[in-house]
Each structure stands twice: as structure tokens, then as C-alpha cells.
Amino acid sequence: MNLRIRDLREDKDWNQTQVAEYLNMSQTGYSKYETGENDVPVSVLCALADLYQTSIDYLLGRTNNPEPYEPIPK
């Protein structure tokens, strides 16, 4: 997962500080997610999925399709 969040960030040409500011955290704290030093909390996973317009399953490596899921019709 840490490689996916790094690759997504780099694809946008963003630095760690920019993503950390979006997440309202320090660059050092965010860096630990990308290196795998710290686990990524669910709340941060949700925020990253929203930021990168992808699914949590993609971030977790459960699918190779980066497209977000379609909402289930009610």
C-alpha cells in the first residue's frame, strides 16, 4: 500500500508536504505512511481515496483497477 500512495502522489507531481497539509498532519507523519513505518488509519485511507479519486481497495492492493466504484443504486 505504501508504494501505491507514493506513486499516486508522484503522478500528481505533489510533494509530501502538500499531501500532509491536505490531511492536516505533519510531513514527517505522512512520510511514515509512505515508507510503511506506520500503519495508515482508516480515516486517512478514506481521505487519500477521496484525494486521489480512487477506491480504498486500490490503495490496499485488493484490486489493480484505480477507478472508484460506482455507487449502488437505491
Model-flagged regions — what are they?
Residues 11, 32, 60-74:
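Short, charged recognition helix plus adjacent turn
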Residues 24, 43-58:
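DNA major-groove recognition helix of helix-turn-helix/homeodomain DNA-binding modules
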